[in-house]
């Protein structure tokens, strides 16, 4: 029998589809406000780069006193700026280790509520940094908002995945990525010089991140806790029943609870795993490797190099209005995330991920060719725009949304929090490497920098083709049980796997 309230067998063997209730909509919307902040703080640092660097220089001059001040050395300015960008990822790396602990201790909903303290503190520090003439405050604020985003990157997919019906789990899981890209787009638009990207208003631009945090603080108390957490982890049948009634809109949820009881009995043989226990578990080795590689495929694809440095990339490519081209990329980003929302339950996770990786690889090669020929063929600047827009579009078809929620699908309730922590750490570590190192690698490799990403994308495509299963339409229990019945990834003969052969139809289907 399928586990969880997501899929419930009917008398004729066909599972009825749970309707979308107002409570479910409110809960998902409230949760993904955190993802909106995550995206906003990825994109907000890009457009005002020059005015923030000017502020850094003014602070540097002011600290030297009136006698013989000299401008900040270019190397020091580059390091300060790279740190301002990349410290966001350091915060995410550190906090991602706490996802499992906090989500088990406080619960999914309360953990998201408490997490907003970091968002308010980080946003306040960034907003007041210029008035205090302190680039250290801005860097600390970026660190705190990164720590907030690190927790969000695990808590939101976990919560949404546990409250979503099976037939909508992919689409609702993709809303996490949609909120991220909308946040990026909002930051890019507000960062224009005609709006908040000015020498006097950039602190307001960075500080606005406190607004969605405050809205989430208002809305989340009206949302139910995950019934899976309440019943399976906390053994609270009454609150779990109440939560299920609100989420499903059904007066009788006894069938759902029966399935949760069945899953709980199975999980009593599989206690919640600590991080070290998960890393040492042969049973979970295969899904863990898949989860980590999928996270690496997202970050090492080069997408955040485009988000962090898109304006300077367009300038290098000879685009006349790079800020507007960057916003164009943000619009493409949002539109194709919506496409992914519509396709993920039809085409499946694996197919979309493969399509996205292949398309990004082709666009990275096209971008390299355009940059190489730019001096001889000025029209190549338009080709570079098409290449970056295509790069972003294919990212949002697959590598953008798929890795986050597929990790939650690959693990049962016991190891899921620890698995989200490992996946989050992998994602944030690679994010930090790109954020800190891309500027230096781009200077060293010149037009060939995107060729490096093309090679990585090809490697991730091959891994996905050979090893990543299709999870569409499967319950958490089915997917987890399938991995328990197969040998470790390291012990298997390498062969293409369009769908795990042991993920056959449930006998009640």
From Swiss-Prot:
Q: What are the protein's UniProt keywords?
A: Cell membrane, Cytoplasm, Diabetes mellitus, Disease variant, Glycoprotein, Lipoprotein, Membrane, Palmitate, Phosphoprotein, Sugar transport, Transmembrane, Transmembrane helix, Transport, Ubl conjugation
- Primary localization class, coarse: membrane
GO biological-process terms attached to the record: amylopectin biosynthetic process; brown fat cell differentiation; carbohydrate metabolic process; cellular response to hypoxia; cellular response to insulin stimulus; cellular response to osmotic stress; cellular response to tumor necrosis factor; D-glucose import
What reaction(s) does this enzyme catalyze? D-glucose(out) = D-glucose(in)
Q: Which residues carry this modification: Phosphothreonine?
A: 486
Which tissues is it found in, per the record?
Answer: Skeletal and cardiac muscles; brown and white fat.
UniProt xrefs under CDD domains: MFS_GLUT_Class1
This chain is glycosylated at 57
**What residue intervals hold the motif Dileucine internalization motif?**
489-490
- The segments labelled Interaction with SRFBP1 in the record are 7-13
A Pfam family annotated for this UniProt entry: Sugar_tr
Chain positions recorded as D-glucose binding sites: 177, 298-299, 304, 333, 396, 404
Q: Which NCBIfam families match?
A: SP
Q: What else is known?
A: Insulin-stimulated phosphorylation of TBC1D4 is required for GLUT4 translocation.
In the record, what disease is this protein associated with?
Answer: Type 2 diabetes mellitus: A multifactorial disorder of glucose homeostasis caused by a lack of sensitivity to insulin. Affected individuals usually have an obese body habitus and manifestations of a metabolic syndrome characterized by diabetes, insulin resistance, hypertension and hypertriglyceridemia. The disease results in long-term complications that affect the eyes, kidneys, nerves, and blood vessels.
UniProt-recorded name of the protein:
Solute carrier family 2, facilitated glucose transporter member 4
């Amino acid at each position: 029998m399928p586990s969880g309230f997501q899929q419930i067998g009917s008398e004729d063997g066909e599972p009825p589809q749970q309707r979308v209730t107002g409570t479910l909509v409110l809960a998902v919307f409230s949760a993904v406000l955190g993802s909106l902040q995550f995206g906003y703080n990825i994109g907000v640092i890009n457009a005002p780069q020059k005015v923030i660097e000017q502020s850094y220089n003014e602070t540097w001059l002011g600290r030297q006193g009136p006698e013989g001040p000299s401008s900040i050395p270019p190397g020091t300015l580059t390091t300060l700026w790279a740190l301002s960008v990349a410290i966001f990822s350091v915060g995410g790396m550190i906090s991602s280790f706490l996802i499992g602990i906090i989500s088990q201790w406080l619960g999914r909903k309360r953990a998201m509520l408490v997490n907003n303290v970091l968002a308010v503190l980080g946003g306040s520090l960034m907003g007041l940094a210029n008035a205090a003439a302190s680039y250290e405050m801005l860097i600390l604020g970026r660190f705190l908002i990164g720590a907030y985003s690190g927790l969000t990157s695990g808590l939101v997919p976990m919560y949404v995945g546990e409250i979503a019906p099976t037939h909508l789990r992919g689409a609702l899981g993709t809303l996490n990525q949609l909120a991220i890209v909308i946040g990026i787009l909002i930051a890019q638009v507000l960062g224009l010089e005609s709006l908040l990207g000015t020498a006097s208003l950039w602190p307001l631009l960075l500080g606005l991140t406190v607004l969605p945090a405050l809205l989430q603080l208002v809305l989340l108390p009206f949302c139910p806790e995950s019934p899976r957490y309440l019943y399976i982890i906390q053994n609270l049948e009454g609150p779990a029943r109440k939560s299920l009634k609100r989420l499903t809109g059904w007066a009788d949820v006894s069938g759902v609870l029966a399935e949760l009881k069945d899953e709980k009995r199975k999980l009593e043989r599989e206690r919640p795993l600590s991080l070290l226990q998960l890393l040492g578990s042969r049973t979970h080795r295969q899904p863990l490797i898949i989860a980590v590689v999928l996270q690496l495929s997202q970050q090492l694809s080069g997408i955040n190099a485009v988000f962090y440095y898109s304006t300077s990339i367009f300038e290098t490519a000879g685009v006349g209005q790079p800020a507007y081209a960057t916003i164009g990329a943000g619009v493409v980003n949002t539109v194709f995330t919506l496409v992914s929302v519509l396709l993920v339950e039809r085409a499946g996770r694996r197919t979309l991920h493969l399509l996205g990786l292949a398309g990004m690889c082709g666009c990275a090669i096209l971008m390299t060719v355009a940059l190489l020929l730019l001096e001889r063929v000025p029209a190549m600047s338009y080709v570079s725009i098409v290449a970056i827009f295509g790069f972003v579009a294919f990212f949002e078809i697959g590598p953008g949304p798929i890795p986050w929620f597929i990790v939650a699908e690959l693990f049962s309730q016991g190891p899921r929090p620890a698995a989200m922590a490992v996946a989050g750490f992998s994602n944030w570590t690679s994010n930090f490497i790109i954020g800190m190192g891309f500027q230096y690698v781009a200077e060293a490799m010149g037009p060939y920098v995107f060729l490096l990403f093309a090679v990585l994308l090809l490697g991730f495509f091959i891994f996905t083709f050979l090893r990543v299963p299709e999870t569409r339409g499967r319950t958490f229990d089915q997917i987890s049980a399938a991995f328990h019945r197969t040998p470790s990834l390291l012990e298997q003969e390498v062969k293409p796997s369009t769908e795990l052969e042991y993920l056959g139809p449930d006998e009640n289907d």
